[in-house]
Amino acid sequence: MVKRQVRRIGAIAAIGLVTALYLITRPLPPIPDGRDVFGFASDTGTRPPTGSVPAIDRYPARDGEQLAFQFYDSTGEVILVFVHGSSYHGAAYHTLARELSDAGIAKVYLPNVRGHYLSGRRRGDVDYIGQLEDDLADLVAYIRGRGQRGPLILGGHSSGGGLAIRVAGGEHGDLASAYLLLSPVIPLAPTTRSGDAGGWAHLHRSRLFGLLVLNAVGVTGLNGLPIIQFNKPEAFRDGTETLDYSYRLNTSFHPRYDYAADIEAMGDRFLLLIGDDA
């Protein structure tokens, strides 16, 4: 009787693993259209003119990788580390950083998240889930090593805001004094759970499901496979964007599945700004 139950459980597990592998190996579906969903054609401020942006600097991560950032000095003592959204990099927030620094509000750091332009060995991937949090902790250690001791705000837009929330709920939750969240992405929240950001983000749902099954039983060797693609029309690409994310990068870039706990960890130390189309 016991042997029969063991065989039955083994058969069910084998079927589950085979199904997961089948879902994972299915190719990424093509993006259905090349619509300019974010209005790149009318946005003259996304990429500032060459020469107006601070030079790329580097800081050492714990694995020895030199990760890219831009620094905007200021007379203010407050430090803002502001994380970019999906696909692009810190330079997209040049105007925000320049205005804050010139006004004496904050010294601003714009990191290029690992797996993006000039940061990391592989575009669209990291080495393990949680590496982006470790990278931000290493950036803060670098900042403090430069003698900058002011209050530190961790901020971000879109996925970058999601990463800030994730940091708050993790082992590096003491990094920041406060948080600045601009339309943060929380994938499992009711407002985004079933959406694709207006056609911007295309998720390979079957592959994601298969990887979730494998990760649940401790199989992580396929986490480097891409699961999401971004719909940036070719006419508006400049070669510095990242057009797909692996499972482990995408997971690292957003709050945990229990996102309420990550949000709760911020307490009342955050400012949330959300706009609309008006």
Language-model features: where?
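The serine-hydrolase catalytic nucleophile loop
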Residues: 86-98
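Active-site nucleophile loop of the alpha/beta-hydrolase fold
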Residues: 180-190
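Short glycine-enriched nucleophile-adjacent loop
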Residues: 161-173, 179
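Alpha/beta-hydrolase active-site loop
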Residues: 126-145
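An N-terminal hydrophobic leader/cap segment in hydrolases
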Residues: 2-60, 68-70
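Short beta-strand/loop motif that positions the catalytic acidic residue
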Residues: 266, 272-275
